[in-house]
Amino acid sequence: MADHDVHTAEAVIDNGSFGVRTVRFETGRLARQAGGSAVAYLGDTMVLSATTASKEPREQFDFFPLTVDVEERLYAAGRIPGSFFRREGRPSEEAILTCRLIDRPLRPSFVKGLRNEVQVVVTVLAVDPEHLYDVVAINAASMSTLLAGLPFSGPIGGVRMAHIDGTWVAFPTYSELERATFDMVVAGRVLPDGDVAIMMVEAEATEETIPLIREGAPAPTEEVVAGGLEAAKPFIRTLCAAQSELAARAAKPVTEFPLFRDYEDDVYDAVAATVRDDVARALTIAGKQEREAALDEVANTALGRLGERFAGREKEILAALRALTKKLVRERIIREKVRIDGRGLTDIRPLTAEVGIVPRVHGSALFERGETQILGVTTLNMLRMEQQLDTVSPRTKKRYMHHYNFPPYSTGEVGRVGSPKRREIGHGALAERALIPVLPSREEFPYAIRQVSEAIGSNGSTSMGSVCASTLSLLNAGVPLRAPVAGIAMGLISDTVDGETHYVTLTDILGAEDAYGDMDFKVAGTRDFVTALQLDTKLDGIPASVLAAALPQAREARLTILDVMAKAISEPAPMSPYAPRIITIKIPVDQIGAVIGPKGKIINQIQDDTGAEITIEDDGTIYIGATEGTAAEAARAAISAIANPQLPEVGERYLGTVVKATPFGVFVSLLPGKDGLLHISELRKMAGGRRVENVEDVLKVGDKIQVEIRDIDARGKLSLVPVDVPGAVLAEDAGAGESAASGGAPRSAGGPQPREHQGPGRPRGRGGDHGGEGRQRTRRRH
């Protein structure tokens, strides 16, 4: 790039009636000191990617040290961060998931044995509200890596495909995604024969999938999803062509990097000759722990017999042993169609499902598949507990939150316990996406939902086990799911025979089959359609036809799992007595202020008096939640009295609460927002006719008193008189639940009885004009 020439290339994506999208690549203008830098544009979305390699290799590493970081800058969306310091902090969940989207196709594209650190930093500079940046970032990262002169088998093209009105649309806009039944990100590379090999897939149905299906849209079945993989291939080819064009003009020459083999041939040959039969016998043991113990003994045997011969090369001996183990596992599957634990290619491990195993929580379930064990726990709460998102995305809140935990003991190991790692965040997001399409709407079920998946035992596909456990737990919590969802992990073993590559697909893979296989293909769905899908591969691409063939095999397994789950629970259970009961009412928008009151005085008073939690939406929808139905009903009555008031009339009696004391009398709350004055002259009657110097000698804030409306003036001000003067003042714990019109028992102030215990040190009075018990403020008369 002499003289800092700026080079560009464009990929034009033609969606027919859905319009044209143009992805533009540019290099030479920004980040010129990076090993390779590129800017990718889609509409006004602008993403900068810089790829740099370290000068010296990390010889002590036995893996490729690739790091991908995505930096979301909130200025990209014209916003200032909401944190205390008003700057970006730790990456958002969306940024972490985008890191994984980039890493998964990039990592297998580097030459094997590379030990130099490679860092890809993607910075989101501008976000078009209509275009998602994650797929743009995949292409930008591929472009910058291609320009950096690294041993990289790119380019890699990434495209988002949405199934809208029966058509697959590339790079859909946000508004178009609202009409999509399926959303899929596909990354791949072009093979020498011109075909496209799929390297990564991340896909899910949408919140609107089931409503759209009911309106006549085609469901995202296995056949439809397979069609989407094929539809993505020409767009990937176009993106790769644009990157290759730019690289031909601006890429650095490929640098020769030192490559480090895990072992030399002489070590492998010696290991194979020494312990091959021992490894083969160990691999016939079905139990994971017993098999691993046997393999550990084989490793000790190999080190004991070969350690002196290959002194100082112990790491090579162990690496060669792993390679031998991998080879034997794959050979047995390819030739004998028998797996490590003795299963056939499509067999599923034993399944068990239970619900309601944890006391007091709102919902719980235990799902087991072989040695994989997932505990699911559901918590319900008010919508105010939705997660608030501070990202560049237009989404600002999330009602359903799925958190996945993977403690080290789940694999019988010791390790760090703390904040979630990228893998845990990714697994939780996958399970979340699998369940979102079947969740009830906010209107049908006005709750914030937190689902936690505890992977307490792991031997393959804890993420898909989390989907199953979560379905069971949600039903146990009483969540009316539109359909149950189950998931299964598929594997792939490939081998070359007579120059032709053969593929064998495995159902329900073990952890070892994941480690020694070529693919981890996770599929979740209902009985009728796919809700989520994820593909990771160690190869530099898999034919789309192989993936399409794996989908029906996954469906058969999914149906089997759903049958087992249905025996545990098939319908939503009654809600836990410890879960909040939420009722919904609608009030006129112009009454929202009256319900809230000055500085929240009225709504806080209602919440204090009833014990209910209240959330008010901008459209006048009010959600009232309480663990007891009576508290929620009391709050609803109080709100209705304000929003749809029945004006007090002369002669009506109320059981009121003293809310303010003044030199000329006390103000008594009859209804929320409706107070009346009990004049000091009336207090004299309660004091036996003697002069009252201090009104609080007779009544204090918080006291309850039976009063009658004597007069209502032209301004609506109420004058009160005490009823049955000798017993007018009630103790704090007097019954206050009854109400009636004049001539019967008195109405209560707002209907509900206040809670007796409000927490230590908390004043019973609340609001801007009155404080705690015994506190007096004077009010100047005008």
From Swiss-Prot:
Subcellular location, record wording: Cytoplasm
The protein's enzyme class: transferase
Sequence ranges assigned to domain KH in this UniProt record: 580-639
MF-aspect GO terms: 3'-5'-RNA exonuclease activity; magnesium ion binding; polyribonucleotide nucleotidyltransferase activity; RNA binding
GO cellular component: cytosol
Cofactor(s) this protein requires: Mg(2+)
Catalytic activity: RNA(n+1) + phosphate = RNA(n) + a ribonucleoside 5'-diphosphate
Chain residues that bind Mg(2+): 514, 520
Pfam families in alphabetical order: KH_1, PNPase, RNase_PH, RNase_PH_C, S1
Domain S1 motif: 651-723
Biased composition (Low complexity): 734-753
Domain of life according to the entry: Bacteria
EC number(s) given by UniProt: 2.7.7.8
Biased composition (Basic and acidic residues): 766-776
Residue span of region Disordered: 734-782
Keywords: Cytoplasm, Magnesium, Metal-binding, Nucleotidyltransferase, RNA-binding, Transferase
Keyword Ion transport: no
Gene Ontology terms: biological process: mRNA catabolic process; RNA processing
NCBIfam families: polynuc_phos, pppGpp_PNP, PRK11824.1
Family: Belongs to the polyribonucleotide nucleotidyltransferase family.
Described purpose of this protein according to its UniProt entry: Involved in mRNA degradation. Catalyzes the phosphorolysis of single-stranded polyribonucleotides processively in the 3'- to 5'-direction.
Record protein name field: Polyribonucleotide nucleotidyltransferase
Native source organism of the sequence: Acidothermus cellulolyticus (strain ATCC 43068 / DSM 8971 / 11B)
